[in-house]
Amino acid sequence: MSTIRCDIVSAEQEIFRGEATLVVATGELGELGIAPKHAPLITRLKPGKVVVTTASGEQLDFAISGGILEVQPQVVTVLVDTAIRAQDIDEAAVRKAKEEAERLLANRGDTVDVEQAQRQLAEATVQLQALERLRRTLKH
């Protein structure tokens, strides 16, 4: 089975590097599935998840805060502000961040940065979804 190298990196660190048979991410215009021999492409990514199917068939879930996806003939590069693997998510901290963002949005005042609160809510929601998907996978 053919593969494509996948690199997921942030400004601070390399988060993942490996061979993949499929990389799925959410671009500005919707879901993208990148397989080996995909046409070159560059697009912005929405906060959401990136799912990498490795050469061994394992699916790895990453929750991202948004970024850029670049596809070249031999490599997919995902440049992100932040990314976290589903199994590394601190559920209690994420739930607290989500509740705080929801509270800020519900009680909007002059000092509330609505865009920041919406971004925080989106990131927390994505992380909780990634965690739930990991739990479902482990049950099977």
Curated annotation (Swiss-Prot):
It comes from Xanthomonas campestris pv. campestris (strain ATCC 33913 / DSM 3586 / NCPPB 528 / LMG 568 / P 25). GO terms for biological process: proton motive force-driven ATP synthesis. Belongs to the ATPase epsilon chain family. Produces ATP from ADP in the presence of a proton gradient across the membrane. This is ATP synthase epsilon chain. It comes from the Bacteria. One of its GO terms (cellular component) is plasma membrane. Its main location: membrane. It holds the Pfam family ATP-synt_DE_N.
